[in-house]
Amino acid sequence: MTISILLAQQIAQLFLMIFMGFLIVKAGLLKDEDSKVLSKIVLYLIIPCVILNAFQVDYTPETVRGLLVAFAASLLMQVVLLFAVSALGRVFHLDAVEITSVYYSNSGNLIVPLVTAVLGTEWVLYSCVYMSVQLVFFWTHCKKVISREASYDWKKIVLNLNIISIFVGILLFFTGIRLPALVNNTLHSVGSMVGPASMIVTGMLFAGMDFRQIFANKRIYFVTFLRLIAVPLMALVLLKISHLADLSADGPTLILIVFLAVITPSASTVTQMCQVYGNDSRYASAINVVTTLASIVTMPLLVMLLQMVL
């Protein structure tokens, strides 16, 4: 019950951040299209800082085992759910924005502050495992779908700052190299902006939308159902039958972290990707807002269901 209450509080905070972005546009201080600059800052600066900072922990056998369990669970979720969502896309004729909004969760913005508040900072590393795995898919699958590219540009993928940050973070962890306190504190400070900055972008885009048109669009409610109900239930079944929680003394907590990452609203980074590559960013933002609103109810209930099942 404590986790469920903290979840609701964290999501409520995200809505206040969205409202701030909304107000700054409605007040005439900025235009909704100005959010594109902030989107690039989030994608190429703030998220890499989150990743690098998360891997600055001591190397121990227990930590490595926990990382392997979290990685296995995260990879299982990403691979199986990708096939499942792709199948749903063909059956229900989902477009590029809808497919990516259903598949990609808002783990980067919500899971880190949530895990910090509920479990403590020592567990943030494991939440970043899921985020790192998702980022690889995000900069390959999502980028290809949103940008409508015919093939993968592997050179751009490998040289992407987010992918580089993942490999550098892993290297620093396994070699035991610790960054100077000044650098690490800077990474932490910049990384802590990921939630507020992403939500402000969403609010700025939302301010330029027609509210009646958004909530009159029945497709949004169906996409919300897929993102917050169908996908989480599939994930719950996968985690249950995989028995990954039995592989570590901290297994149940690690599985909880991965499940939390899966059941979050649609990724705000999909909106940012749409902005950067010229897809329908307003529709993506509308899906993000509606799923975030609905997740106030769905996330606490799903966590309670997980605790009953495991």
Label each PLM-derived region with a short phrase.
Residues M1-L310:
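Alpha-helical transmembrane segments of multi-pass small-molecule/ion transporters
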